[in-house]
C-alpha cells in the first residue's frame, strides 16, 4: 500500500508528512465511518474556492461580479474535480468498503477524493 501511495505523492508532487492524512483523504465512509475524507473534502472545497476566487480577481480586476461568478462556477464544480481526479487516476487509489468494491469507483467518490487532497 505504501508503494502505491508513494506513486500518488509523486503524481501530485507532494509528500505527506503524515501518511494517515493521505489515507483519510482517499478513504470513503463505507471503508471507515470515522477517518474518511468527508471533513478533508469540506476543507478542500473551501480552499479551492478561495484560491480560484483570488486568481479570478487577479486575472480580471475590472470584470463584473456576475461574470466572475460564472467563471468561478465553471472552474469549481464536481465535474471539474472529477476530471482532475480521473487524470490523477484516483479511482485506483480510492479506499472503499467491500460493498463498493463490487462496482467501479463512482465519479462522485473520485471528485470527493480530489477535493480532500486539496
Please identify what each model-predicted range represents.
Residues 1-118:
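RNase III-family endoribonuclease catalytic core
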